[in-house]
C-alpha cells in the first residue's frame, strides 16, 4: 500500500469525529501529536478536574499547573501506598519517538484508566494531553472457541439467540483500530450492555500485508472456524477489529437479508453525540465540523510518517443511511439487519461459497485500484463482534485503500515489501502471545516458505543491537543487548540463534542479556532481525537490519605507513592484539552481571555517538591518503569496540592484557594516534595511567611519537603528565613524557606537558588537610591548569606568530608561578616537620604524623598571635640602644660577659683533667699490662700492628623523613627541569605553533565535553522532574495488567 508520507498527502483529521471516537478508544500517537502541536486552537485547563468521567480529554500547561494529576480519582498506588503507580513508555510515529506516555489504572475500578501524553520536543513538552477512558471487560481467551462453535452448530440447523445478545456491526475490509499502544485492551475488550440487543455476524476479510498490526500482542483476529462467545448468550468480539464501513452487498446477499427487515426488534437506541469533557476548540480557531488540514495545522514528521489517514472523498453507501454529523449508521437499520442474521447463518455461509461469481458486484463501489486491496471472503472469516456503544460507527472514509491507521513496525514493513503480492497471509494470536504462521503463496516451493515466525511465548527482550547495517559481503559481528525472561538454568539449556531475514545463524552468550552473532552475506535490502531458539520462531521483538550495497575494501597498513616503518609494526601488533579472544564459560555468564552490563552499555553508547558514515559518503575534499586512513579507522573502530565488549565479559585481566612486546591496546592506540579509541578503552575499565612492561603510560607513547591530538585528549581526560617511566641504567631517575617528547624534537609537546605537570602537581598538593591556607587559595587563582587555559583569540590584524608568542609567554608565566609556589609549599612542609620534632620526636603519645604536622602548624600559628607583647618589648629595647653611645656600651658589656663565660667553662674542664689522667693510667696498668700481659701504651706503634677486622655494626635506624627529604630533592630537580622545558619551548617558533595547536585541541575537547554533559544533565533533570510523581514501567504490574501498552511503536 502506498505510503502517504512519501507522497506528501496532508492528513485530514475531523476533530469532531476524533473527539467522538475518544469516548470508546484511545487516540493514536499521530492524532495526539496533531492536537499537541495545535494546542493554541483548544482550551487549556487552568485547574485540575474533579473526578472526570470516561472519555474526558484535557490539555494542561505543566509550567502553569504542576499538579494536574490531582483529579479526585483513586488510582492504583505503589507499595508505599502514597505515590501513584504509573507506567511509562515512549510512543513512536513511524520509526521516531515523539511522545511520552504515562498511564495509571483505577484502584476501585481497574478498567478505568488515565493516560498523560506530552511531546519529546523541547518547545512543546510543557503541554500535556490527558485522556480518561473506561475499558469494558477483561482479556479474551480464544481457547475453546472451536469447541463452542462445534457445539453450537451440531445440535440444530440454526443458531438461536435470545433478546439479550449484543448488537454488533459488520467490519470493513481493513482493520481500523490499530491505535496507540492499547491494542491489547482494545482487541480483547468484552463489551457488555444491559439493554436487550441482537447479534449480527461480523465479516472479517483477509488483510493486506501492510495493514497487519504486528505489535497487537493479544489481538483476536478471529477464530476463523466459528463463533466467539462468552458469558452465556452475550457474544463478544475483538474491539480492535472494529471498522468504519462496509461495502454495498451484491444482489443475492441483499435478497437473503430482505426477510429480516420485517422481524420484530427492540426499541432503537438514540444516537447521541458523546461529550468530550475538557477538550473544547477555541472560538475563532476552527469552524464547527471543519477538518484540520495542512492549511492551518502542521504535519508532524512529514518525511518519516508511515501511517494512513482517510482521504477527503467518501464512497456512497446505497443501503446504509449515515448520520451527517456523527458519521454513525442508523440504529434502526442496524437492528433490522442484525435481528435475524444469526438464525440464518447457513444461508449466509452458502452465499459466501459463491463469492467468485459475485465478486464483480461486491467490488462495484470501488475503483480499479481500490478493488485490488479487497481480499476474498471465506466462511472462516466470520466472527462475532459486540459494540460498547451498541452501534458501531461506519465511517465512509475507511472504504479507501489508505483508510486504516496501520502500525508500521519493522516486521510489517518487511512483510509489505516482501509479501505485497501475496493474498493469503494468515495471522492469528492466542492468549500466550503472537503466532505468525507460514506464508502460503503461489511462488513458495512445496507449499511452504522460510518467512519469519513469531513464537507463542517471548523469552528475550531486545533493548538494542549494534551494528544496524553492514555491506552485503561483510560478515560483521552483531552485538545484541537485552534481557532474558527465563531463569539462568533455562537460559543455558537453550541454543540461541539470530535470524537475518530467512537465514538463521548461531549466537553466543557473552553475559546475561548480551548475545553476539555474525551477520551472514546477504543481498541488498532490509530484513527482519530477531532472536530465536534455533527453531526459526522469534522469541523476541522484531527489528530491522540493513544490507547496503558495496563490498568491503581491505587495506593493509603498508598502503598508508609504508613497508618498513615503526607505524606499520605498531599497526600489525594492534591488529594481532585485537584478534586475541577467549570463550566465555557458562558459569561466568551470570557473574558480575551489573558491572559488565554497565561497561557494555557505555561502550555501545560511545559507538552510537561516533557512528561512522555510510559507505560512499566520504568527503570529496579528502586526499587519497586521508581517505585510506578513514577507511582503516572505520574497520579498526568496529573491531576495537567488539574486542572491548568481549574482553569486558571475560574473566582475568580483561582489556588490560599486554601483547608479546609488553604493550596494551591503550599504548598501541596512543602510539598510532588513534585518539578516537581512548574513550571506549577507558569505558571498558582500563586506567588512563595504565603502564606497559617498561613503565610507559599511554601519554609516554603519544609524546614519544609526537601525536598532538592524542596528547591533548589524554591530558584532558586526566592523564598524569608527571608520571615517571621505570628507571634504567641510562636514566636512573626515570623519564617523564615531556622528556621523551623533548628527546624526539617535539618541543611544543614537551613544553605543554611540562606546564601541565607543574600546574597539576600544585593543584594536588595541600599543606594542611583541615584548613585551606591562603597560599593554596591564591595559587589556585594565580596558576591556571591546562583545563582552564584557553588559546589567545584571534582578532583583526593578528598573525599566527604573534598569537603563538602570546600563548607561549603566558605558559612561561604560568609555569614559573606554579614552580615558585611549589617551592614555598616544600619549605612550609619542612618547617612543619621541624616543629613536629620539637613537639616530641619519640612520639610518646602515639599520634600520627599528619596529626602532628597539623598540631605543629597550629602551634606555630598560635605562637605568632601570642608573642605580640614580647615583640613590642624587643622593639623598645632596640629603640633604646639605637644610639651609638648606648650601642657601644652594650657591645662592651656583651664582650665581657662572653669572656667570663669562656673562663668558667675552661676552668670546669680543667678540673676534670686529673681525674681523667688517673683513670686512664689505672686502666693501662691493670688491664693492658697485668691482665693481658702486654706492653701497655708504652712503645705503641700503629703501623707494625695489623689492623683488626672491624665488627659489622648494625645499620643505624633510618628515619622516614630522610627518605622523604631525598625524594623531595629529586622532585625539585624535576620541577626545575620542567620549568626549563617550558622556557625552551618559548624560544622556537615551531614549538610555539605546536603548543598553540595543543591548546586549541584541548579547548575544543573541553567544549564538546561540556555540551555533552549539559545535555546529559538536562535529560537527567527532566527525568527527575518526571519521576517526582511518575514511576518507570513496573514489570509485575504489566504482567498482571490486561491493558498494558505494546513496547513496539516503530
Curated annotation (Swiss-Prot):
Q: Disordered: where is this region?
A: 141-196, 223-246
As recorded in UniProt, coiled-coil segments are 957-985
Gene3D superfamilies the UniProt entry points to = 1.20.5.190, Ankyrin repeat-containing domain, Immunoglobulins
**A GO cellular component annotation in the UniProt record:** nucleus
The free-text function statement in the UniProt record for this protein reads: Transcription activator that binds to the DNA consensus sequence 5'-[ACG]CGCG[GTC]-3'. Regulates transcriptional activity in response to calcium signals. Binds calmodulin in a calcium-dependent manner. Involved in freezing tolerance in association with CAMTA1 and CAMTA3. Contributes together with CAMTA1 and CAMTA3 to the positive regulation of the cold-induced expression of DREB1A/CBF3, DREB1B/CBF1 and DREB1C/CBF2. Involved together with CAMTA3 and CAMTA4 in the positive regulation of a general stress response. Involved in tolerance to aluminum.
What tissues is it present in? Expressed in roots, stems, old leaves, petals, sepals, top of carpels, stigmas, stamen filaments, anthers and siliques, but not in pollen.
> What is the organism of origin for this protein?
Arabidopsis thaliana (Mouse-ear cress)
Name the record gives this protein: Calmodulin-binding transcription activator 2
Q: Where in the cell is it found?
A: Nucleus
Q: Which part of the chain engages DNA, per the record? A: 15-141
Intervals holding ANK repeats: 661-690, 694-723
> What's one GO BP annotation on this UniProt entry?
response to cold
The annotated phenotype of a deletion mutant is: No visible phenotype under normal growth conditions, but the double mutants camt2 and camt3 exhibit dwarf phenotypes.
> Where is each IQ domain found?
870-899, 893-922
Per UniProt, which keywords does this protein have?
Answer: Activator, ANK repeat, Calcium, Calmodulin-binding, Coiled coil, DNA-binding, Nucleus, Phosphoprotein, Repeat, Stress response, Transcription, Transcription regulation
Induction, as annotated: By salt, wounding, abscisic acid, H(2)O(2) and salicylic acid. Induced by aluminum.
> In the record, which positions carry Phosphoserine?
984
User: Where do Polar residues bias regions lie?
Assistant: 141-171, 183-196
Residue ranges of region Calmodulin-binding? 918-940
Amino acid at each position: 500500500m502506498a505510503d502517504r508520507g512519501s507522497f506528501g498527502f496532508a492528513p485530514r483529521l475531523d476533530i469532531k469525529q476524533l473527539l467522538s471516537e475518544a469516548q470508546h478508544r484511545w487516540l493514536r500517537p499521530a492524532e495526539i501529536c496533531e492536537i499537541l502541536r495545535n494546542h493554541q486552537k483548544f482550551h487549556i485547563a487552568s485547574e485540575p478536574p474533579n473526578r472526570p468521567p470516561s472519555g474526558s480529554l484535557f490539555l494542561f500547561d505543566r509550567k502553569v499547573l504542576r499538579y494536574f494529576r490531582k483529579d479526585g480519582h483513586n488510582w492504583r498506588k505503589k507499595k508505599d501506598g502514597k505515590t501513584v503507580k504509573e507506567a511509562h513508555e515512549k510512543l513512536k510515529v513511524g520509526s521516531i519517538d515523539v511522545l511520552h506516555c504515562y498511564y495509571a489504572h483505577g484502584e476501585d475500578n481497574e478498567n478505568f484508566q488515565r493516560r498523560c501524553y506530552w511531546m519529546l520536543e523541547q518547545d512543546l513538552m510543557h503541554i500535556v494531553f490527558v485522556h480518561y477512558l473506561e475499558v469494558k471487560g477483561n482479556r479474551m481467551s480464544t481457547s475453546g472457541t472451536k469447541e463452542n462453535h462445534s457445539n453450537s452448530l451440531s445440535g440444530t440447523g440454526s443458531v438461536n439467540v435470545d433478546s439479550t445478545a449484543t448488537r454488533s456491526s459488520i467490519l470493513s475490509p481493513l482493520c481500523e483500530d490499530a491505535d496507540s499502544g492499547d491494542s491489547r485492551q482494545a482487541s480483547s475488550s468484552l463489551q457488555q450492555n444491559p439493554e436487550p440487543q441482537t447479534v449480527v455476524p461480523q465479516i472479517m476479510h483477509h488483510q493486506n500485508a501492510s495493514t497487519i498490526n504486528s505489535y497487537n500482542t493479544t489481538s483476536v483476529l478471529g477464530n476463523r472456524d466459528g463463533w466467539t462467545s462468552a458469558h452465556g448468550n452475550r457474544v463478544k468480539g475483538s474491539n480492535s477489529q472494529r471498522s468504519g464501513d462496509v461495502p454495498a452487498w451484491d444482489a443475492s446477499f441483499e435478497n437473503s437479508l430482505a426477510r429480516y427487515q420485517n422481524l420484530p426488534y427492540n426499541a432503537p437506541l438514540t444516537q447521541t453525540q458523546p461529550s468530550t469533557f475538557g477538550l473544547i476548540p477555541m472560538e475563532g480557531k476552527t469552524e464547527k465540523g471543519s477538518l484540520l488540514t495542512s492549511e492551518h495545522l502542521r504535519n508532524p514528521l512529514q518525511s518519516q510518517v508511515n501511517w494512513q489517514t482517510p482521504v477527503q472523498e467518501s464512497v456512497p453507501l446505497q443501503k446504509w443511511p449515515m448520520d451527517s454529523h456523527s458519521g454513525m449508521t442508523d440504529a434502526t437499520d442496524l437492528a433490522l439487519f442484525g435481528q435475524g442474521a444469526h438464525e440464518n447463518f447457513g444461508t449466509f455461509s452458502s452465499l459466501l461459497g459463491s463469492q467468485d461469481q459475485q465478486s464483480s458486484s461486491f467490488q462495484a463501489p470501488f475503483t480499479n485500484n481500490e478493488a485490488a486491496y479487497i481480499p476474498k471472503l471465506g466462511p472462516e472469516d466470520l466472527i462475532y463482534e459486540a459494540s460498547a456503544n451498541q452501534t458501531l460507527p461506519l465511517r465512509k472514509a475507511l472504504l479507501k485503500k489508505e483508510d486504516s491507521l496501520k502500525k508500521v513496525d519493522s516486521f510489517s514493513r518487511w512483510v509489505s515489501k516482501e509479501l505485497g503480492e501475496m493474498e493469503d497471509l494468515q495471522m492469528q494470536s492466542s492468549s500466550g502471545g503472537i503466532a505468525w504462521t507460514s506464508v502460503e503463496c503461489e511462488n513458495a516451493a512445496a507449499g511452504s516458505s522460510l518467512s519469519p515466525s513469531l513464537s507463542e511465548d517471548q523469552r528475550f527482550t531486545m533493548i538494542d543491537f549494534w551494528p544496524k547495517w553492514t555491506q552485503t559481503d561483510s560478515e560483521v559481528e552483531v552485538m545484541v543487548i537485552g534481557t532474558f525472561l527465563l531463569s539462568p538454568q533455562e537460559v543455558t539449556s537453550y541454543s540461541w540463534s539470530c535470524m537475518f531475514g530467512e537465514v538463521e545463524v548461531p549466537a553466543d552468550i557473552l553475559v546475561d542479556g548480551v548475545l553476539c552473532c555474525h551477520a551472514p552475506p546477504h543481498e541488498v535490502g532490509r530484513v527482519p532481525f530477531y532472536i530465536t531458539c534455533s527453531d526459526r520462531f522469534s522469541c523476541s521483538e522484531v527489528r530491522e537490519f540493513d544490507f547496503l550495497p558495496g563490498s568491503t575494501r581491505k587495506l593493509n597498513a603498508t598502503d598508508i605507513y609504508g613497508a618498513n616503518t615503526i607505524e606499520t609494526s605498531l599497526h600489525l601488533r594492534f591488529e594481532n592484539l585485537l584478534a586475541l579472544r577467549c570463550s566465555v564459560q557458562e558459569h561466568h555468564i551470570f557473574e558480575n552481571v551489573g558491572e559488565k552490563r554497565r561497561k557494555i552499555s557505555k561502550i555501545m553508547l560511545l559507538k552510537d555517538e561516533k557512528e561512522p558514515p555510510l559507505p560512499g559518503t566520504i568527503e570529496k575534499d579528502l586526499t587519497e591518503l586521508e581517505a585510506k586512513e578513514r577507511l582503516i579507522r572505520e574497520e579498526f573502530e568496529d573491531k576495537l569496540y567488539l574486542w572491548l565488549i568481549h574482553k569486558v565479559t571475560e574473566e582475568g585481566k580483561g582489556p588490560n592484557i599486554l601483547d608479546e612486546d609488553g604493550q596494551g591496546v591503550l599504548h598501541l592506540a596512543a602510539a598510532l594516534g588513534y585518539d578516537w579509541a581512548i574513550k571506549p578503552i577507558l569505558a571498558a575499565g582500563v586506567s588512563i595511567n595504565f603502564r606497559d612492561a617498561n613503565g610507559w603510560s599511554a601519554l609516554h607513547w603519544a609524546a614519544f611519537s609526537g601525536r598532538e591530538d592524542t596528547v591533548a585528549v589524554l591530558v584532558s581526560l586526566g592523564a598524569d603528565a608527571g608520571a615517571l617511566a621505570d628507571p634504567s641504567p641510562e636514566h636512573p631517575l626515570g623519564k617523564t613524557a615531556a622528556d621523551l617528547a623533548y628527546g624526539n624534537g617535539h618541543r611544543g609537546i614537551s613544553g605543554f606537558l611540562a606546564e601541565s605537570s607543574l600546574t597539576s602537581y600544585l593543584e594536588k598538593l595541600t599543606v594542611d588537610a583541615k584548613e585551606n591556607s591562603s597560599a593554596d587559595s591564591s595559587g589556585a587563582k594565580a596558576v591556571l591548569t591546562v583545563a582552564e587555559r584557553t588559546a589567545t583569540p584571534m582578532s583583526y590584524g593578528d598573525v599566527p606568530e604573534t598569537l603563538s608568542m602570546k600563548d607561549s609567554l603566558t605558559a612561561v608565566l604560568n609555569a614559573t608561578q606554579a614552580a615558585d609556589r611549589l617551592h614555598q609549599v616544600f619549605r612550609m612542609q619542612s618547617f612543619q616537620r621541624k616543629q613536629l620534632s620539637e613537639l616530641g620526636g619519640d612520639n610518646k603519645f602515639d599520634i600520627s604524623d599528619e596529626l602532628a604536622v597539623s598540631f605543629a602548624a597550629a602551634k606555630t600559628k598560635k605562637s605568632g598571635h601570642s608573642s605580640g607583647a614580647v615583640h613590642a618589648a624587643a622593639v623598645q629595647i632596640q629603640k633604646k640602644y639605637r644610639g651609638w653611645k648606648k650601642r657601644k656600651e652594650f657591645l662592651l658589656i656583651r664582650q665581657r660577659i662572653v669572656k667570663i663565660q669562656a673562663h668558667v667553662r675552661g676552668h670546669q674542664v680543667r678540673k676534670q683533667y686529673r681525674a681523667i689522667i688517673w683513670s686512664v693510667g689505672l686502666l693501662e696498668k691493670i688491664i693492658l699490662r697485668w691482665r693481658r700481659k702486654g706492653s701497655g701504651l708504652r712503645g705503641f706503634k700503629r703501623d707494625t700492628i695489623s689492623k683488626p677486622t672491624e665488627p659489622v655494626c648494625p645499620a643505624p635506624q633510618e628515619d622516614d623523613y630522610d627518605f622523604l627529604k631525598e625524594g623531595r630533592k629529586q622532585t625539585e630537580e624535576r620541577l626545575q627541569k620542567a620549568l626549563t622545558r617550558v622556557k625552551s619551548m618559548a624560544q622556537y617558533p615551531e614549538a610555539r605553533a605546536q603548543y598553540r595547536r595543543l591548546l586549541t585541541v584541548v579547548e575544543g575537547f573541553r567544549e564538546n565535553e561540556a555540551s555533552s554533559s549539559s545535555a546529559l544533565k538536562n535529560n537527567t533533570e527532566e527525568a527527575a522532574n518526571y519521576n517526582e510523581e511518575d514511576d518507570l514501567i513496573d514489570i509485575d504490574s504489566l504482567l498482571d495488567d490486561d491493558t498494558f501498552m505494546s513496547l513496539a511503536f516503530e
